[in-house]
Design a protein with these regions (language model features):
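Structured, helix-rich domain cores that form ligand/interaction pockets
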Residues: 2-16, 23, 27, 66-345, ...
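Short alpha-helical segments used as structural interaction elements across diverse proteins
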Residues: 21-22, 40, 45, 58
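Residues within the helices of the helix-turn-helix
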Residues: 22, 33, 47, 62, ...
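Residues in the recognition helix of alpha-helical DNA-binding motifs
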Residues: 24, 38, 49, 350, ...
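Alpha-solenoid HEAT/Armadillo repeat architecture
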Residues: 26, 51-54
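Short alpha-helical DNA-recognition segment
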Residues: 29-48
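Short, basic-rich loop-to-helix N-cap that marks the start of a DNA-contacting helix
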Residues: 53-66
Length: 408
């Protein structure tokens, strides 16, 4: 694998290899810090390698190439953490924020209410930490989709990976309550209406006894984060069980939310593995044992479901895998890698709300002012006062990621 980069079929010498490697890294749009975290080395060491200040061994070439290929934008499948919920058996919320999340609590907003019967919480963006005086409840960390992406920006600045964080959480006694693994299909290898039809035709061999499907635009009767734009959706398994799958058209969601034409969407479909309690714990244990996201994800999928083609002259247990499904689970395709998509906390949702709900009224008032000279906005601003929460958000938005994180 260390001779992966070639010119005219000739293996490169070290200088050429380093240049070709650095060019490929830039082509993939990967920073040195991000790649170093994935490879398990320091950014400074990677910088010295790319500048030719230290020799690069064959072993290091393999390690760097494996790390870099995890960011290959042409990979047909990628996987992300899309939901993480962990309960810690402690009432010391400061310890969890400081030592496990490694964030500075002074930049987090405190609210005297919570969810899941917790009584208060701290949050920054979509990263929520709940607490309660009830020792049995302890402290609860919740990262939904956006929270995972935002937390990845902090992990990157901390030079930590998801594996590092999960290990820290479990060592500290963390109890997995939920884990969602999202497999993104970038090429359309999954056909959700076809999978739904196979479920109806008994071409879905599964230990699950139920499935539900919804057409594009149909109300998804479940507590989904993005239920308004999920497109064709198929649930395999009971939503009340500790493991079930949700497969939906991500391209439709991107069209509804961002206006991206369906045919141009970078992600066509998404296959989500949703795990709770003991199932979530065993998945994390497997991830931390093998550091192989594909192994963990597809061992779960293959344990619970497979799609086949009906063969009239054979028993159902002997029907062959559907070609499209076989490709999805690993036959003749590039390996799936655990990737990250760090996104800083922004005011995008607030700005979109202002644009839809507030700005038309502001524009109306400005027009009236221009025609009559009566400045309603100026009068309103005189009595407007910012709350402590507003000042905290200002602080969050004007502070660098490096200042929000804590070094262990």
């Amino acid at each position: 694998m260390s001779q992966f980069f070639r010119k005219g079929g000739i293996a490169l010498n070290d200088t050429e290899w380093i240049q070709d490697f650095a060019d490929r890294r830039l082509q993939y749009g990967v920073s040195q810090t991000k790649l170093a975290v994935m490879a398990g080395i320091s950014r400074e060491h990677l910088s010295r390698i790319e500048s030719g200040k230290v020799a690069v061994t064959e072993e290091m070439k393999v390690k760097l190439l494996e790390a870099l290929e995890k960011f290959n934008p042409e990979a047909p499948l990628t996987m992300l953490f899309d939901y993480v919920r962990i309960r810690f058996p402690t009432l010391d919320i400061g310890h969890i924020i400081k030592d496990i999340l490694q964030l500075n609590i002074q930049y987090m907003i405190h609210e005297d209410f919570g969810h899941y019967s917790y009584t208060e919480h701290y949050y920054i963006g979509d990263i929520f930490v709940y607490t309660s005086p009830d020792e049995e409840k302890g402290v609860l960390l919740e990262l939904k989709g956006k929270g995972c992406r935002q937390f990845e920006s902090y992990l990157l600045a901390q030079e930590r990976s998801w594996y590092d964080f999960l290990m820290d959480a479990l060592v500290d006694g963390g109890v997995m309550k939920r884990l969602d693994l999202a497999i993104n299909d970038h090429t359309g290898m999954l056909d959700i209406p076809e999978l739904t039809e196979k479920c109806r035709n008994e071409e879905c061999v599964s230990v699950f006894r139920s499935f539900k499907s919804y057409a594009s635009g149909e109300l998804v009767k479940h507590e989904e984060q993005d239920k308004a734009g999920m497109g064709y959706t198929l649930y395999i398994g009971s939503l009340k069980s500790e493991v079930y799958f949700c497969v939906y058209e991500k391209s439709y969601e991107q069209y509804i939310k961002l206006g991206i034409p369906i045919e141009e969407a970078p992600i066509k479909n998404r296959f989500e593995i949703r795990l709770k309690n003991e199932r979530a714990y065993y998945a994390v244990r497997d991830l931390l044992t093998y550091y192989d996201a594909e192994r963990t994800a597809f061992s779960i999928i293959n344990r619970y479901v497979r799609f086949v083609d009906k063969e009239a002259d054979k028993k159902r247990s002997d029907w062959k895998l559907s070609v499209r499904w076989a490709w999805f689970i690993g036959e003749n395709r590039e390996p799936l890698k655990l990737t990250t998509k760090p996104e800083p906390y922004t005011l995008d949702r607030t700005l979109r709300w202002i644009q839809r709900q507030v700005d038309p009224t502001l524009k109306m008032l400005e027009t009236i002012t221009a025609k009559t000279g009566v400045d309603y906005l100026k009068e309103i601003r005189k009595s407007t006062k910012l709350t402590e929460k507003h000042y905290k958000i200002i602080e969050q938005q004007t502070t660098s990621t490096e200042d929000v994180i804590l070094e262990k």
